[in-house]
C-alpha cells in the first residue's frame, strides 16, 4: 500500500485528498481524533484537536507514521477505545479493503461522542479507474469498491447525518507523470460535467443522538431530614399541652 502512494498516480491521489481533509478537519472541534488507515500520511495535520491517534495493524505499518501523533496497533474492526470517547474518526480507504465494513462503521459510531464527526474516503466504483480492476492485480485495484450513496445509507442507519460529500480525481489511471499532466484538464471539466464520476469520494457525517438530555450534576448538598419527635413526646404534647393552654386562658379570664 505505502509503495503505491509513492507512485505518480498515488501522489496525485493523496495530494487531492490531503487538500480536502485539511479544509474539512480545520473546522471540526473537539479533543481526541483518530485516523484509521494510511498511517504513512498525516491526514489529521490540519485538525486543531490536541490528541491525534493513528491505528496500525503491525509494527511495520507503524514505521512510516508521522512522529507527531500516537500509534496504536489494533484490529480496525475492534477499536481499543471506550464508547463515546472520541470526537473525530477518519476512515481512509478502509471500507473497500475490510472483510467486515459494516462492523468497522459500527465501531466508529460506538467510539464517537454525540455530535462527533466521521470523515470517510473511498474509491468510486463508477469512475474510469474501475477498469484497472480487471487488468492490474495489485493494491488498490483488488478492493471491493463501495459507492458514496451506499455508504451514506449505512451512515444513516447508524444514526449519522451526512453533512457534505465530494468527488475528485478525474484523470485516467496512468502511471506516467507526463500523461498525468496531459490529462490534468479533466479535473476541471469533470467537476462541472460529470461530478459523480471522480475516482474517489469523501463523506463527512455527524453522529446524532436524538432525544438526549444533558443532566447537570447536583452540587448542592442534600440536607438531612428533620428528626421526628419520639412517640412519648408526641403523646405528651397531645395530652398535656392543650389543657395547659386552656387552663392559662381560663386563669386570665378569672
Regions found by a protein language model. Name each.
Residues 185-254:
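C-terminal lobe and adjacent flexible extensions of AdoMet/dcAdoMet transferase-like proteins
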Residues 142-165:
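Short alpha-helix
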Residues 77-89:
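A short acidic, Gly/Pro-enriched loop at the edge of an enzyme's catalytic core
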Residues 19, 23-79:
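Class I SAM-dependent methyltransferase SAM/SAH-binding core
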Residues 1-26:
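Class I SAM-dependent methyltransferase Rossmann-like catalytic core
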Residues 117-145:
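Conserved class I S-adenosyl-L-methionine
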Amino acid at each position: 500500500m505505502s509503495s503505491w502512494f509513492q507512485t505518480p498516480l498515488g501522489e496525485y491521489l493523496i495530494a487531492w485528498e490531503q487538500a480536502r481533509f485539511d479544509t474539512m478537519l480545520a473546522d471540526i472541534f473537539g479533543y481526541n481524533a483518530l485516523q484509521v488507515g494510511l498511517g504513512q500520511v498525516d491526514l489529521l495535520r490540519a485538525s486543531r484537536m490536541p490528541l491525534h491517534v493513528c491505528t496500525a495493524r503491525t509494527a511495520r505499518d507503524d514505521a512510516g507514521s508521522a512522529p507527531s501523533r500516537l500509534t496504536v496497533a489494533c484490529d480496525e474492526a475492534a477499536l481499543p477505545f471506550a464508547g463515546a470517547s472520541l470526537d473525530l474518526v477518519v476512515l481512509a480507504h478502509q471500507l473497500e479493503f475490510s472483510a467486515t465494513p459494516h462492523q468497522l462503521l459500527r465501531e466508529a459510531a460506538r467510539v464517537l461522542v454525540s455530535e462527533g464527526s466521521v470523515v470517510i474516503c473511498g474509491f468510486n466504483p463508477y469512475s474510469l479507474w474501475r477498469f484497472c480492476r480487471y487488468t492490474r492485480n495489485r493494491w488498490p485495484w483488488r478492493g471491493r469498491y463501495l459507492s458514496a450513496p451506499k455508504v451514506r445509507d449505512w451512515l444513516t442507519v447508524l444514526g449519522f447525518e451526512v453533512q457534505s460529500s465530494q468527488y475528485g480525481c478525474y484523470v485516467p489511471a496512468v502511471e506516467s507523470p507526463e500523461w498525468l499532466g496531459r490529462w490534468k484538464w479533466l479535473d476541471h471539466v469533470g467537476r462541472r460535467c460529470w461530478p459523480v464520476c471522480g475516482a474517489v469520494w469523501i463523506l463527512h457525517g455527524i453522529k446524532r443522538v436524538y432525544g438526549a438530555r444533558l443532566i447537570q450534576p447536583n452540587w448542592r448538598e442534600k440536607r438531612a431530614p428533620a428528626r421526628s419527635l419520639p412517640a412519648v413526646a408526641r403523646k405528651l404534647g397531645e395530652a398535656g399541652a392543650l389543657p395547659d393552654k386552656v387552663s392559662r386562658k381560663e386563669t386570665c379570664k378569672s
